[in-house]
């Protein structure tokens, strides 16, 4: 029997716990989402209240939508059809200029010349049918 099982990041979802919790027991997975901050807990509760689950995929989608929302507000998009080209360019430039933003579990940094996002992470472990945070490097 293995002493340590490390799982694929995208497996840290509610579906795994619903479908094969016993088989996943003890599995350790690095992930970019767990409800460890007030805002992450709020988003997880909203997802549950609406029949969903918050995981690294849906949390990333939430973060992306909120980033776009903040940029739209910051550049002053009006929605006026006469300004569509200028406003599209302003949003594009606003997104490109972002170097850091607040994510659900901490600050997200962007490597400008690569376009790669550096996100905080935690390690979760499958324990009794739930994902339990076992390492939080904050």
Residue spans for each PLM region:
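Extracytosolic ligand-binding ectodomains
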Residues: 1-138
